[in-house]
A protein has these predicted regions:
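Paired small-residue
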Residues: 10, 81-88, 96-105, 295-303
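Helix-breaking motifs and short loop linkers at transmembrane-helix boundaries and internal kinks
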Residues: 38, 70, 91-97, 236, ...
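Conserved MFS/SLC helix-loop-helix module at the cytosolic interface between two early adjacent transmembrane helices
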Residues: 57-96
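Helix-to-loop junctions at the C-terminal end of transmembrane segments
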Residues: 59-71, 256-268, 357
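Cytoplasmic helix-loop-helix junction between adjacent transmembrane helices
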Residues: 95, 101-140
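Intracellular juxtamembrane helix-capping segments at the cytosolic ends
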Residues: 112-124, 310-326
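C-terminal membrane-cytosol helix-exit motif in multi-pass small-molecule transporters
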Residues: 168-188, 380-383
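A late C-terminal transmembrane helix in Major Facilitator Superfamily
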Residues: 322-360
Length: 404
């Protein structure tokens, strides 16, 4: 492996870290932003929804439209757009301009992860491809563990705008790394056409998986979007303590993601998803009652982190399995559309959570989120029964996992 290859992966990983931080840090800043811009918590929560919609549009649509653009040029342009979006957020005079900033960065996010995996595998030997993708996506996990609590801490002490300025600085570093270390000549796979995307969306069994994904994440983010508000307004944690709790949550997420992947490998995606969705619904329901006690809510947040993102490997494995059965010519497209489904779920969950907060109160978000996750569990059981009817086993062997 040449000296330049790990540096190219480092640039991609740093980009993933910056993007992961800007996506999730907003959750810890919602109370601060709402107070500073004089908007309601649900309005601040829409900043999560609109970012996710940007990702959902960016992943399939912009990836198809930019298929002929050289990969390095596109990567640099994406990091430039991402940096500009965060600078707009830093300078945002009001709520409307902050919305524009979130949509811009969301669009960059969607395409970055669509092409990032391709670039990562292009700069290493074929037998190192999976490891290269894993290294790049480590940036997302590290963002949850360190970037989000650190960004929340910065926002609470220096103002929320300072957080976006710090993320913009990371974007500049990632942009320079891409310019310097990512090779200019990279193989280009055939661009996914809109026809291929529509062919995937015409398959009921794939739509079923996308619904599982959207409902599973929608239920999670219905409550998670307002977690910082719950911790401050209901549990009584100080703003500083919320940063520490989010750090603990991020560590738990990292562990849960590994656990979820191993469970899907051992038992197959449907049994793993059934267990994880069931536990997730239970933990969200428990949060409704434990939020009033700081020690109990801390334990509940730990449990929530362990299961909230543990479904990602199983869902991605499963959508690839189903694509190989029904649209083998468009497996990559099917996997990419599942990323869009994740973010549609996030957008709808955050929006619905805002309606719940507005109309019946903050502490109704966990149990309503649990009901949405139970709907995902029901669809998972249905899909598993259809597989058994078709004589399909639940093994996950031989499937490469992409991630959020």
């Amino acid at each position: 492996m040449s000296r330049g290859i790990p540096l190219a992966l480092l640039a991609l990983t740093l980009g993933a870290f910056a993007i992961g931080t800007t996506e999730f840090v907003i959750v810890g800043l919602i109370p601060t932003i709402a107070a500073d811009l004089h908007v309601s918590l649900p309005s601040a929560g829409l900043l999560v929804s609109l970012y996710a919609l940007g990702v959902a549009v960016g992943a399939p649509v912009l990836t198809a439209l930019t298929g002929r653009v050289p990969r390095k040029t596109l990567l640099v342009a994406l990091m430039l757009l991402f940096t500009i979006g965060n600078l707009v957020a830093w300078m945002a005079p009001g709520y409307g301009s902050l919305i524009v900033a979130r949509v811009l960065t969301g669009l960059a996010h969607g395409v970055f992860f669509s092409i990032g995996s391709i670039i990562a595998t292009s700069v290493v030997a074929k037998d190192k491809a999976a490891s290269a993708i894993a290294i790049m996506f480590t940036g997302l996990t590290v963002a949850l563990v360190t970037g989000v609590p650190l960004g929340t801490f910065i926002g609470q002490h220096l103002g929320w705008r300072a957080t976006f300025l710090a993320v913009a600085a990371l974007g500049v570093i990632a942009l320079l790394g891409s310019l310097l270390f990512v090779p200019r000549e990279l193989p280009r796979s055939a661009a996914a056409t809109f026809g291929q995307q529509f062919a995937v969306l015409a398959q009921p069994r794939l739509l079923l998986v996308y619904a599982m994904t959207a409902l599973g994440y929608g239920g999670t983010f219905l409550s998670f979007t307002f977690l910082a508000s719950i911790l401050q307004d209901v549990s009584g944690f100080s703003a500083n303590a919320v940063s520490a709790v989010l750090l603990v949550y991020g560590v738990s997420v990292a562990i849960g993601n590994l656990w979820g992947g191993r469970l899907a490998d051992r038992r197959g995606p449907i049994p793993a998803l059934s267990l994880i969705f069931g536990l997730l619904a239970l933990v969200l329901l428990v949060l409704t009652f434990t939020a009033y006690n700081q020690w109990l809510v801390l334990l509940t947040v730990l449990a929530l982190g362990a299961v909230a993102f543990g479904n990602v490997p199983g869902l991605q494995v499963y959508v690839v399995q189903q694509a190989q059965r029904f649209v083998p010519q468009a497996t990559d497209v099917a996997s990419g559309l599942n990323i869009a489904a994740f973010n549609i779920g996030i957008a709808l969950g955050a929006w619905l959570g805002g309606l719940v907060v507005d109309h019946i109160g903050l502490m109704h978000t966990p149990w309503i989120g649990a009901l949405v996750v139970l709907a995902a569990l029901g669809l998972t059981v249905l899909s598993g029964s259809l597989d058994r009817r078709d004589g399909i086993t639940a093994r996950a062997d031989g499937i490469a996992v992409a991630t959020h």
